[in-house]
Amino acid sequence: KMISSVMKYKGFYIARYEAGLDKTSKAIVFKNASIEKNNTITTNANNNETMNWYGLYKKIKTFTVGNDKIVSSMIWGCQYDAMMNWMAKNDKLIGKPDNSKINSDPNGITGISPDDVLNNIFDLYGCHREWTIEANLTNYRSRRGSDYGQLSLYPTFRGQDSPSSTDPAYSSRATLYIK
């Protein structure tokens, strides 16, 4: 369905921010995920539902429940690649580390660093590595990008981990497409 939609409408939407968690409702939030007292980025969530691949996949799919025209999904690996290619075509440095842009605060507010933004998409150089739907080998899922502790990584970096891993440096980014 996603591929048909992309072909028909000539694209898809990517969340500007990494996924966060509303402390009270446990709902996924994206914009300024930790600015308000009731929201937190996944590093602070201490909640397996949002720190592992399975939990984030399930939560992000519920972001547009009730909307019969739009579907939300965890970002696919090919969508992440498309985002990186789009940025590279617009002269953005994405293929090697740029430590001047790194967001090295694991508890930092999502989207607060003016340097860690490319084409209005935040936190690609730091904060969290991002889970994707992409499979890697038989038992793993791909995670992309850098995190607050990995100054040698870069936005196009591809790694893998078990989907049940609960590393606090992992988050994800949602995509939206039209039905």
Functional labels for PLM-detected ranges:
Residues 123-124, 169:
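Residue-level recognition of short, solvent-exposed, well-ordered loop/turn junctions
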